[in-house]
């Protein structure tokens, strides 16, 4: 026992031997003294614990050897269990596992266990492991054609070699850390669990074969993709930041801007583990406007600066979600008469704070323009600036708008939302993963607040084109099959999320009631159906390019509209939305699988297009891109982006302003952003515009040059790029206004 468990005290030894201290202490003390006098044991004077001497360890090893030889002669086996103990083999445990884990009938379980025992005795293995026994049982199940039982009995996890590879390669992925290694290993387990236990074989096989791509597979069974927060219950003090007040302190309603921002910081921090990709705060400057009344500009900025630094220290988008603020250039009409939480309680309505709304927005944009102490950009939050019909109505609004264009010109970390379009509805909210929700679902609150994307299924459109061989009816039929798989997967996702919230209590904030419903409106949260490879599918199917042929464009629109109409027909049983955005790079995986399946030749194959309806690696006039994007944005209500990637020299602030105004007044574009590339040299702490392999200032050309650009709609440091993102950054074409 001491050989196995380490040094133990007199009392601990008696407890492990299940001896009674009152009746057995004398007898036990006598035997312990004999072992000590024989120099098999010795006592540590400081701790009072007994340990094996060198001689005692040798005797212990000899006894183990004799016992092992006797067991082998008798045909007995020892098992290293998954609970990290060594126990004699018991066949009944195989029977119990088969019944418990796979619902195998007892008679069949008895038969399989006997066969497994016979096979395990043959190799004369000194120590069996639970994993090895499971492999033998699974092999027997396969031989008997009992594959469904084998599925349920499969042990999840990585082989030893794969774990070693994960450890060795993690230093070259994202931001390396031991926690990142741990997360990568856990990701593999939960992804396998999703394939084997949660999704039907048809859906799992469709993903693994490359017909579809399940985004966030590692978190599919644990949490939704994103959330649109409503900060008002927290500002009122109705709910603690974690929902329960158990994990975090329960604070009273904040009485100052500093307190309000602390509350938001705590909310975002506690919620970062509850969603996979993104968190968004709508009406950020409107809801916080009451807290800056009578404050000086300098005081507002000092408090806000600390808040922004805190966000950027905590949220990098690798180990946790990224943050977006949806901000307004005016108090929307539907909020003007809504009661406003303030330092004095619910005093007044939001319409009373129109001046403060713009003052806070101006301060936020000033600080985002500043960057950090090393003149690098602040990547959090992503700003979505909503431009309603009265966006240019006041001088103060115009000043804020010009600050936003200055941010676009300097860092590019701002997205412009055309809220004046009828199809954008009364209110629209975007997340930093570019998911979109609007008020066409019920109303502006139920549709856009306390909701989030369940997740995203991307359809491999080129695979459908290869199978239909130019036949429109076959294309439509195969697309419908994939849409039905996507819908089924998202329905399952909603059921799983309901279990996590209601039964498993893994998402405590989401289940806490506010206004007679859970904080997270699960039934109002959409599942997204997106697509990859639209231009490639159209080219293969029609032989024509979307960018320069009306027939090709019509076919592309028809395909995307089919996704949108199918999603609409699924309502109201489940809220589904079509999207042109994936939450993670998927195109390279799908391209590689199509190469492996023989649809493409490896040498000539180019990566499919994603996050765009025209290939970004091909030089296409900006006007053509604009014309196409305008059409597709209106039928992809779950997410889209017109990413205007510009080269150097970059346009002036005034040119950006005039261009955006013209687009928003004359086209149907709902969301656009300007992307500017820049390089940060850690060696000399200098930012240079463009992607440079040698620092223009100090000529440094080593690995401390860090590139920044939007990859798939989001600014990321090159230290966090995947290979797909690196290829995207360097191969996508830049335009000029």
Question: How should each PLM-predicted stretch be described?
Answer:
Residues 7-17:
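Short acidic, hydrophobic short linear motifs in intrinsically disordered regions
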Residues 36-46, 572-576:
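A short, conserved structural fragment
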Residues 68-175, 727-734:
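Charged, amphipathic alpha-helical regulatory modules used
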């Amino acid at each position: 026992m001491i050989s196995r468990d380490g040094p133990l005290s007199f009392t601990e030894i008696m407890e492990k031997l299940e001896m009674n201290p009152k009746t057995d202490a004398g007898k036990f003390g006598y035997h312990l003294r004999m072992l000590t006098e024989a120099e098999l044991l010795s006592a540590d004077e400081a701790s009072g614990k007994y340990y094996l001497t060198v001689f005692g360890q040798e005797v212990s090893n000899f006894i183990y050897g004799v016992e092992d030889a006797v067991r082998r002669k008798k045909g007995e086996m020892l098992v290293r269990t998954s609970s990290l103990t060594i126990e004699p083999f018991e066949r009944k445990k195989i029977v119990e596992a088969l019944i418990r884990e796979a619902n195998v009938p007892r008679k069949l379980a008895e038969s399989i266990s006997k066969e497994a025992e016979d096979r395990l005795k043959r190799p004369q293995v000194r120590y069996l492991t639970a994993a090895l026994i499971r492999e033998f049982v699974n092999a027997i199940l396969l031989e008997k054609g009992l594959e469904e039982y084998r599925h349920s009995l499969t042990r999840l996890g990585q082989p030893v070699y794969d774990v070693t590879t994960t450890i060795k390669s993690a230093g070259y992925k994202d931001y390396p850390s031991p926690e990142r290694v741990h997360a990568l290993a856990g990701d593999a387990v939960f992804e396998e669990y999703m394939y084997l236990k949660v999704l039907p074989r048809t859906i799992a096989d469709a993903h693994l074969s490359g017909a579809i791509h399940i985004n966030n597979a590692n978190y599919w069974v644990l949490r939704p993709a994103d959330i649109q927060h409503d900060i008002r219950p927290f500002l009122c003090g109705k709910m603690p930041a974690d929902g329960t007040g158990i994990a975090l302190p329960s604070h009273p309603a904040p009485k100052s801007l500093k307190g309000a921002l602390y509350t938001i910081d705590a909310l975002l921090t506690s919620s970062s583990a509850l969603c996979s990709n993104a968190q968004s705060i709508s009406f950020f400057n409107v809801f916080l406007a009451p807290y800056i009344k009578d404050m000086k500009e300098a005081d507002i900025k000092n408090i806000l600066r600390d808040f922004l630094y805190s966000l950027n220290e905590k949220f990098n988008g690798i180990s946790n979600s990224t943050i977006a603020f949806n901000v307004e250039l005016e108090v929307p009409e539907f909020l003007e008469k809504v009661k406003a939480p303030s330092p004095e309680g619910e005093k007044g309505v939001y319409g009373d704070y129109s001046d403060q709304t713009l003052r806070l927005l101006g301060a936020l944009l000033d600080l985002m323009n500043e960057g950090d102490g090393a003149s690098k950009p602040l990547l959090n939050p992503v700003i979505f600036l909503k431009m309603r019909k009265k966006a240019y109505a006041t001088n103060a609004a115009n000043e804020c708008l010009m600050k936003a264009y200055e941010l676009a010109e300097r860092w590019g970390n701002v997205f412009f939302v055309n809220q004046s379009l009828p199809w954008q509805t009364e209110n629209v909210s975007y997340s930093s993963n570019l998911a979109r929700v609007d008020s066409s679902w019920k109303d502006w609150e139920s549709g856009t607040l306390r909701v989030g994307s369940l997740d995203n299924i991307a359809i491999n459109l080129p695979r459908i084109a290869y199978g239909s061989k130019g036949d429109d009816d076959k294309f439509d039929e195969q697309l419908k099959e994939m849409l039905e798989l996507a819908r089924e997967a998202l329905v399952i996702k909603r059921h799983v999320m309901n279990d996590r919230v209601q039964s498993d209590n893994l998402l405590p904030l989401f289940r806490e009631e506010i206004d007679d419903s859970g904080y997270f409106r699960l039934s109002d949260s959409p599942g997204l159906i997106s697509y990859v490879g639209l231009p490639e599918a159209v080219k293969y199917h029609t032989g024509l390019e979307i960018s320069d042929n009306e027939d090709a464009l019509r076919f592309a629109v028809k395909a995307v509209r089919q996704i949108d109409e199918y999603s609409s027909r699924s309502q109201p049983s489940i809220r589904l939305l079509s999207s042109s955005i994936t939450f993670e790079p998927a195109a390279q995986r799908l391209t590689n699988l199509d190469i492996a399946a023989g649809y493409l030749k490896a040498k000539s194959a180019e990566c499919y297009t994603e996050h765009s309806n025209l290939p970004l690696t091909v030089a296409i006039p900006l006007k053509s891109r604009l014309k196409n994007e305008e059409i597709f944005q209106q039928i992809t209500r779950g997410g889209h982006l017109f990413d205007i990637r510009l080269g150097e020299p970059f346009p002036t602030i005034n040119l950006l302003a005039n261009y955006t105004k013209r687009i928003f007044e004359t086209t149907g574009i709902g969301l656009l952003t300007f992307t500017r590339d820049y390089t940060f040299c850690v060696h000399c702490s200098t930012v240079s515009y463009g992607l440079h392999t040698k620092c223009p200032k100090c000529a440094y050309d080593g690995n401390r040059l860090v590139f920044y650009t939007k990859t798939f709609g989001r600014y990321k440091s090159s230290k966090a790029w995947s290979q797909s993102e690196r290829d995207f950054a360097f191969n996508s074409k830049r335009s000029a206004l």
